[in-house]
C-alpha cells in the first residue's frame, strides 16, 4: 500500500473511551466501498491485526455482501442505456473541423500525414469528451442507473465499455495495427451501419482470437520461468554479503513509473538509516515496512542501500535477509520457502491476465507525440508582455508560436478572468486579441519519449502528369571523397508542392507506330496507332512519347547519364525509352526488321531516334561520368513547331502565339570560363512565354541547387514589361536572357546586368523588327557569383569532348572552382529547343545559339558549301592481359563558310560531332592499327551521335551505335539497345596491298576479343558487310579487293527487359475548366499553378486548383490539377513530367510517433527480453542484450579493469537492464510486480560464462559453465579465461548442471543421449528432479532432514542429506565412473587428491530396479550406523573431502562443533 493510498484510506476514529477493557478503539469507515476500497481495507487490516483476524473479518464482509445482494437486484433493460443529449452537437463540431482540414488538404496547404493526424486527434478528442458527457449525464439524471453502477463498481465492466454502449464506438485499427481514419460514430444502443460493422469486426477479432492464442503463449512463458528458477530455495538466514546495490525510482521519460517508496517496501536495509536531525530511523538488517518507507521518503533520498537477491553470497539458493519480506504475509521469509517458483508465477501470471485486455487507444498513430492544451473557457486572449516568437509548424499543419521562456496568458470573458502559465517549449496556436471558445485547442506540449519514425505513402488520386513547385532535392557529396561528383538524393530538403495535372492516360505496347501527333484533335474511337487501338475519351493530345518525326522536322534528343541513389529501387524508371525505326531499302528488296535484330543483304539506310529524358529523380546536370547527346536538323516549316516535350497549349489564330517552354538548365558561364563538376553555377529556369501582337510577358521560377561546398549570391534586378493590359514588374535574376523583340523572325536580346541593382524606376523595353539580318546578337547575363568554401584542388584528369560547333579544352580549370572542372559548351534556354536559343536566317524556324568556348572552331580559307568529315579511328593500344583504357577519339567535323559572322552566333549546317566514351576492356592481344578515312559529302548530312556504354554504372542511357559505310558515305545505323552492352565477340580486320610482283604485304592486323555475359536474352546476329576499298600500287594500276568479315554479337541484356509501355495523355473536356473574365484583368501569368481559393482575375477566386493554360480576351482556361504538400525528408518516387496513373505512389512522407506500450506488443517484448533474443536486420540503435554484454565488457576492459572484475561489472549492469526493461513493460500496463521476483530470473540468466581458454582443466573452449565454478577453479593452479554472456530462459534451463530437469523441459532425447555420452551426474538438488523421481522435495520442512539430536544422530542420514545425494550415471560400474576423472570431478566442482580414500567410508551400491530411466543407473551411498567419534583419521579425511566436493559445504576439516553448526 503506497502513501497515496494510505492517505486516501484513513479510518474515522471515534473519541477515546473511558472503558479500560477496550484495548483497541473501534473504527468506523464512512464511505462507498468499491473494489479498490475493499482491497485497501483488507491490506490495512492484515498489517494491523494479523492473519487470523483478517480471515474472520473477510468472512463477515462476505456475509454482509450476500445479505445486501438479496435485498435488491439489478436488472438491465434497453431503456437503461441513455445516450447523452450533447452527442449530435459534438459529432457536428468534429465533422466541421474535419471538413475544414479536408479543404486545406485539397488546397495543398497541409500534407497527407498532417491531415491524417488531425482526423485521428479530432475523433479521439470527440470520443473522450463524449465519455465525460456520458458520466455527467448519468450523474445528473439517474445516479442509480444499473449501467452506471456496474461500470463504477469495479466488479465487471468499465467506462470504456459503457462508452461503446451509449457514447460512440470510436476508432479501430486494421490488421496491420494502423488506425483507420473512419471512426464508428454509432454506439450499440443506436446500432451500427454495415460499414461500421465491418470496421468493428477488426476489433472483435482482437478480443476473441488473440486472447485464445496469447493465453497459450503466456502459459508457456510461465512454464519456462518455472523451469529456470525452480531450484532456488531459501536455505540460510544471512550470508554476510560484501556489496550492496543502490536502488532508486524507475522512470519512463520524465514520468516516474515505479516510485522509490514502493520499491523499498519489503526490502532489508543494508546499513542504518538516519533522518536529517541525525536520529536513527532503522538499523541495519531491518525489514522496511510502510511506516519506515514513509520516514525514509521524508528525507528525500535519491538512492538507498539495501540487500538484494543479486548479491546474495549463499552457495546454493538464497538467504532470508537478502530476499526480504514474504509479500503474502508481510514478514521476513522462512527457510525452506521455494521463492524461485513464486517468482516465476508472479511474472508469468500477469502476462496471462494482460492478454485478456486489448487496448484500442485511438492515438497509436501519433500516440503521445504531444500533450494538448485546451482553453479553460470562452473569451479573449491577452498576452501581458511582448514575446519573441519563433514560428513553427504544428503536426496538424497550423502555424504556431514556439515560446522560449515561461509566460502567462490571460483569458478574459465579461467579468471572468483566468491566468494560465505555459512553460518554455510549448507551441501556442492563439494570437493576441483572438476569441476562443471553451475546450478549443490552443497549444500543444511535445512529449518526451522515444520517437520512432514511420513512412506513409502518398498516392495519386487521378491520372495525369507530375509537376514540381519550388521543390528542392538534397545534394550530397561523399565525405570520404571531396573530388567525387555531387549526387542528387531523392529526399526533399524543403516544404514544397507536387502537382498532378489531370489528363486521361492511354497505354500502348512497344511495337506500335503512333499515328496521332502532338496537337492533333482526336475523337472517340479514332485510330491513334497502327494496331488500331482506340482512344476511350475525346480530347486533345498534349503529351506523347516517341512522336513520329518527318525528315524536315526539328529533332532535339537528349540523354543524361547515370545517377545513382541509395535506398531507391535498383532500376530507376526512365520517363520514356521510345524508339523510332525507319528502314529504307534499295534495289526493291524488302528488309526484315525486328525489335532487337536487323538482318538484310541489301544496302540499308536505317535511322533510329530515341526519345528519352533523365531517369527518375535526377535533375539534368553535367557531371564527370555523364554522356550527353545533341542532334539538330534544319526545319523548313512555315510556322513554329511546338516542342516535342511537355507542352501545355499551342494555338495559332490571328497571329497570336501561346507557347510553353521546356524547363531546363541555364549554365551561367561566359566563353573562356569553366564549369565545376558540382554544377553549382547552374540555375534552373522554368519559363512561360506569350507573344501576342507585340506584347511579351515572362514568368520565371528559379530552382537553387543545394550544395555543401558552395555559397551562392544572386543579385536581382527589376524588369518592367509593357503590354496592353499594363506593366509587369518582374524580379529578374542574373542568368536570365530576356527576349525583347516583337516578332518571331528576328530577336534582339538585352543584358540584364547582375552587378547593377535597379531600383523602383522602370527599364523601358524597345520594340524593333528586322526583316532580314546577317547576325543575331544575344548576350548572356553575368553568372551567379560563386564563392568557394573549401580551398581549390587541382584535378589532373583530362577529358576532351569535341563537338562540331564547339570543342572542349583539356587541362583547363577555373581557379575559383573546387575539385575537377571541365570546360563545357554553354547553352541558353529558348522556348523551342531543349538547350538552344532560336533564330533562323530568312526562315521562321529554329537554330541553336551557342556561347562558344575559347577553343574556336577551325575555319578554312576557301569558300564553299560542302561539308568534309574526317574520321579518326584508333584501335586499342594493347598490353597483354592487362586492363587498359580504350580511347576512341571523337569525330571532328570541319566546315568552311564564306560570310563574315558575329562570333556569338554560328549558322547551323546540320553537322554535329559525335563523342565516344572511354571504355575499360580486357584485351587479349597486343597489336594496334590506325586508319584514316576521308568521306566527301556532296550535300550536308546529319551525322547522328555515336555513343557507347561503359557498363560500369548501373544506370546508363540507351546505347546507340553508328556504323559508317565505306562505299559512298551513306549512314547505316544500328538499333539502339536499352542498357545493353554490345561488344564484338571476335573481330578480324585486315588491309592488303598487292603490288606488281604479286607479293602480298600485310600492312597491319588487329584482333580484339571480349567476353560478354547474357543476362536475359541470347541473340546472335551475324552481319555480312561487303565493302570495296581502293588501293593504288606502285605501277598506278588500281586493283579492287572485296573483304568479308563475320561478326558475332552477343547481346548482354535485351532491348527492353520487360516491355516498353508507351503512354499518351489525352486532355478531355472534363480535365479543363473555362471561366469568363468579363474583361477583367487576369492576375495570374500564363502557365502558372493556381491553388483553390486564390484570386484568378479581379474580384473572382478559383473553385479548383490547376494550371492556367490559355488566356483569351474574354475567358481563361484552367487545366484541373491536384496539389500535394510534401514535407521535409520525404522520399520522392516520381520525376518531373512523369506520366502517372491513379493510385501510383508519388512519395513516402515521414512522420513521428512515440513507442506505444500496448500489451499486444508487451508480451512478445517481455519474451524477447527474457529469451535474450538477437534481433535480425541492421538496427540503427543496438537494443538486444547480446550486443550490450559485448560492448559493456569491452568498455570495462578498455578502462583497465581485470577480466574477473570486468565480467562482474558487466553482469551487474545486465541484471539491472533486464529488471528495468521488464518492469517498464508491465508498469506501462498498470501491472505491479515486485523487483525481487525479476531479480531471481535475471540472476539465473546472468550466472554463467563462456569459456574462451582453459588450461589443464579438461574444459573445452566454447563451453558454458557457472561463473562461481570458474572463479573457484581459478583459485588453484588452473587458469580459465572467460567472458560474460546472457542466456535466455530456455537456454538457461537446458544448460543446468542436472540433466533430469533439462530432459523433462525440452529436447528429451538429445539431453539424455548427451548425458549418457558425457557420463553426467545429477545431484538432485532442485525440486523438479525430486518430484520426477518421487522423492521428498528439498523445500519447506523437507530441507531440514530428520535426526535424533545434536550428538545422537544418524551419520548415514546426515551424510545422505547434507553431503552426498544419489548419483545418476550412465557408467556400468562405480569404479569406471570414478576413473573418468575429468568429467566426474568437473561435476563435483573440485579435484580431490586420492579418490581411493572414498571407498572404505562410502561404498556406493547400484539399485538394479532403477535402470528404467533411459538405461541410467542410480547409485545410492551406503553407510554403517555408528557415532561420529568412532571414525578413524583416514575416514575423517574422506568425509572432509566429501564435504569439500559438495557445493553447499566449505573446504575444511570437520569436527563435532562444525558438524553441529551444519545441523
Swiss-Prot record:
User: Per its UniProt record, what HAMAP family does this chain match?
Assistant: RNApol_bact_RpoC2
| Cited function | DNA-dependent RNA polymerase catalyzes the transcription of DNA into RNA using the four ribonucleoside triphosphates as substrates.
What's a single GO BP term from this record?
DNA-templated transcription
**Main subcellular location:** plastid
Chain residues that bind Zn(2+): 239, 312, 319, 322
Q: What EC number(s) are associated with this protein in UniProt?
A: 2.7.7.6
Q: Which domain of life is it from?
A: Eukaryota
Which major enzyme category is it? transferase
Q: Where is the composition biased (Polar residues)?
A: 860-869, 997-1007
Q: Where in the cell is it found?
A: Plastid, Chloroplast
| Catalytic reaction list | RNA(n) + a ribonucleoside 5'-triphosphate = RNA(n+1) + diphosphate
Region (Disordered) residue spans: 836-869, 987-1007
Q: Which GO terms describe its molecular function?
A: DNA binding; DNA-directed RNA polymerase activity; zinc ion binding
- Basic residues composition-biased segments: 987-996
Listed cofactors = Zn(2+)
| Cellular component terms (Gene Ontology) | chloroplast; DNA-directed RNA polymerase complex; mitochondrion
The species is: Nephroselmis olivacea (Green alga)
Return the InterPro entries for the record.
DNA-dir_RpoC2_beta_pp, DNA-dir_RpoC_beta_prime, RNA_pol_Rpb1_3_sf, RNA_pol_Rpb1_4, RNA_pol_Rpb1_5, Rpb1_funnel_sf
Q: What is this protein called?
A: DNA-directed RNA polymerase subunit beta''
